[in-house]
């Protein structure tokens, strides 16, 4: 546990610092804000790829979705904790850089950061304070398969990150941005929304229950935890769909015009 925590604490901030240094050298014309935004998104994408790999490994290895074990289901959570803490700092750095010209006090910057990123801050805080203890201690030796499923939700993150990078670099007019938008919505739908019915279905297959019977045959806290997890995903998905609709409506209007 301690070695994994230490590895994460070195890996993510180190990768962030290396990314910023490399971007400054490779793209000297970029602003500090550009480098910070791209560097932050690169680290997020690397974490997402690692999480997805860990999740798929656990899912494939666990034939019994309730009782089978895989060491990555526990160890990757310890590796993820430093990332969550690092991500708070990275988001704060981006906010501080964005408002640098306004000469704001640190207290004002922190307040603005918490307001602008309130959903993401809440998401990370809930994971650290509630879901990590549940995953690492309270669930005992059960449910590694479902932990692996949750890891695979990160598959959509690289596409979300690429979209944010392209917006920062003012590349919204390109075909790549539109294609990436379709991939973002698709991966988000399958890996962050439909993932939850899939987990219920998998449990039902193991226990001989239909999908609709599963919620009434598992502990209440499992349903509550899933509700907490899926709620922000539904909100983010609605935002993605609205953004995608505006993007293609604009493109259609330009074509008709």
Curated annotation (Swiss-Prot):
Location of the TLC domain: 33-249
Transmembrane segments: 1-21, 42-62, 71-91, 114-134, 142-162, 181-201, 220-240
Keyword terms: Cell membrane, Membrane, Transmembrane, Transmembrane helix
SMART domains in alphabetical order: TLC
Cellular component aspect of the GO annotation: plasma membrane
Signal peptide annotation: none
Lipid bilayer topology: Multi-pass membrane protein
Keyword Coiled coil annotated: no
Localization: Cell membrane
Protein name per Swiss-Prot or TrEMBL: TLC domain-containing protein 3A
